[in-house]
C-alpha cells in the first residue's frame, strides 16, 4: 500500500513533523515513538500506549494525524478528560498546522458549526470530553458525520475506560460501543502513563482483543522523592511557607479538596509568596490564566486539586508537593510526574496529614451509589410518563442532586435510562440488575490502594522503585536520589512562631453564609423575608476550632469558652451595615440547653440583650439525614414561630440569629423569615461551624 512506503521510505517526513510540533529543530524521537506512529499509520492497528509522563504520547497521535490526513482519512477524534489537557493539546496541534476544534463547556464552537466544518473537510482534529458522547445532539449530528469518513480515534488517559482504574469515568464506557461500530483496519490509540496490568487488560478487552500494547519504562529520572509526616495542618502550612521558597523554579501544591486549595493559597499569599489557586469551580478564564502563568514561569506556586491533572503539559515544573496524601500510588505517580519532564533535577514531596484518611474514605464510600438509591431513582422514572429533570427526581427522593446525576449517568451508560435533550431523562425497556459483587470488588481494591499509599509513606526503600513496581514495572532497583536512597530525610525544620501564626490563621478562616433567594418549592423569597449574609467560625472537625466544636457537641455537652471568645472576635471584625441590637438563637429538641447557653454567653461578652423568642412548632428530623435541598427545606418549613410569651423591644433593630451548626442554611432561612415577618429589619445568621460539603 502507498502509505506503507510513505512512512518507511520517508522517515524524514516523520522527523520533520515532530520538529515542527515541538518547535525544536534538533528534536528526535524518544525510543519507541517512531514504532508507535508506524503501528497506527502503516499497520492501522489498535494500539495501547503505556509510557511515562513526558515521554511524548501526544506527539505520536499528532504526527499520525498529520500523516493519515495526508493519505485521505477523516479527521482524528481525540477524547480527552480535562479542559486543561484539551487546551494543551490544541495549542500543540496547531503548531503542527492541524486545524483543530474543541467542543466543551467553555468553547464557543457550536455543534452545528462543528458539523458544517466536518462536512466541508475543514477540520483535522476534533477534541471532545467523554461526557460529550452522552449529548443527544452531538450523537445525532456529529457522530454520523465522523462515522461516514472516520480517521484515527484517540482515547487519552485510557485507564479511565476501566472501572478497575483509579480514575474511572462511566462516560468512557460509551467509547467501547463506539469502537465496536468501526470497520476493521481503522487505527485506534489509547494512551496512559498510569495503569497496571489489571487495568490494561480491562482496557484492552474494551478496545478489542487484537489491540497491541506498547509499554515503556516508567522511571522518572532526576525526580527526587521524599515523604514527611506532619499530621497537624498548621505544621504543614508553616512547612510550605518556609521551604518552598528554597525550591528551584515553579511548582504545584496538590490538595484533596477545593476548600483546602483556597486555604493553602491564602496562607501562601499572606506569607508573601507568589501563589494562585486552581480548582473546578473557577471560571475558565481564571484557570487558563493560572495555567499560562505556570507555563511561562511567572508564577511560583499553583495550588490545585486534581482539576489540574492528567496531561497538563509543562516540562519545566521544578517541584510537586502534596499537602495531603492521594488515594493511590498510581494517582500519586501521575501527579508527582508533573515535575521535571525537561529538567535535570526536580522534587516531589508528600506531606501526610491526620485528615487524609477521612477524606479519602469519603471518596471511596461515595464512588458508587447503593442499590436502594438506584432503585428509588428508577421508581420515579417508571412512574412518570414524561421525561424528568434531576431536580424533579430530587423532590421525590432523599438524595443529593450530585448523587442523582451520578446514578443517572451510570444508568444512561448501561442503557437503562435515556437522556432526552441535555437536561431530562426517561426510562428505557432495558432490565437492570445491581452488580453487587463487582461494586464490592472495586471498593475492596480502592481500600487496598489506600493501604498501598500508606505503605509508600512508611517505606524505607527506594521511593521511585516503589511507585514503578506498583505500575508493574520492575526495571528499577534504586533511583539513588530519594530521601531513603540518600539517607537524607525531608527537612522538618519549623519556626515555632510561624506554626503559631498558621494555627491562628486556620482559626480565622471564617466562612460566609449566603442567604437563600428561593424557598423549598422554588418560589422567590421576598426581600423583606430574607436573612442577610452571615458568617460561620470554622469547619466541623477541622484542626483548632473545628475539633473544639465537635468535642463540645458530642462529648462535653457545652461549648468551650475559647469558642465563645472566638465568636465574639468574629462579630467584632464583622463590618455590619447596621449594627445588631441583640442576639437570639435556634431552639433545639435534641440539645435544648446547648445553643441557649452559647447564645447567653456570647450576648454577655458583646454587651447585647438576649432575645429568647423563637420556639419549635413541631419536631423535625435532623437536617443531616436530609440529602438534598428540597427535602431539607421541606423538613423545616413552618417549623418555627415566635413564643406567645415573647417580650420584644418597643423598637426592633438588627439581630444576630445564632446556631451551633450550619449545613443547608434552611434552618436559618426559615427561622430568620419568622423574625423578619415580626418586624426585625435585618437578621444576621451566625454559626460555630459548617458541615456543608
Regions inferred by a protein language model and the residue ranges of each:
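DG-centered beta-turn motif at the end of beta-strands
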Residues: 658-661, 665
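Active-site signature of alpha/beta-hydrolase-fold catalytic machinery across serine-
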Residues: 62-63, 67, 202, 597, ...
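C-terminal accessory region of SF2 helicases/translocases
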Residues: 299, 321, 325-334, 340-536, ...
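Helicase motor core with emphasis on the C-terminal RecA-like subdomain
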Residues: 2-11, 16-21, 31, 35-58, ...
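PRPP-dependent phosphoribosyltransferase catalytic core
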Residues: 486, 501, 505, 669-693
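Active-site-facing substrate-recognition patch
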Residues: 223, 498-582, 591-592, 596, ...
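Arginine/glycine-rich "motif VI" loop of SF2 helicases in the C-terminal RecA-like domain
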Residues: 338-345, 369, 576, 605-606, ...
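Conserved beta-strand elements of the Class I
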Residues: 75-77, 101, 252, 276, ...
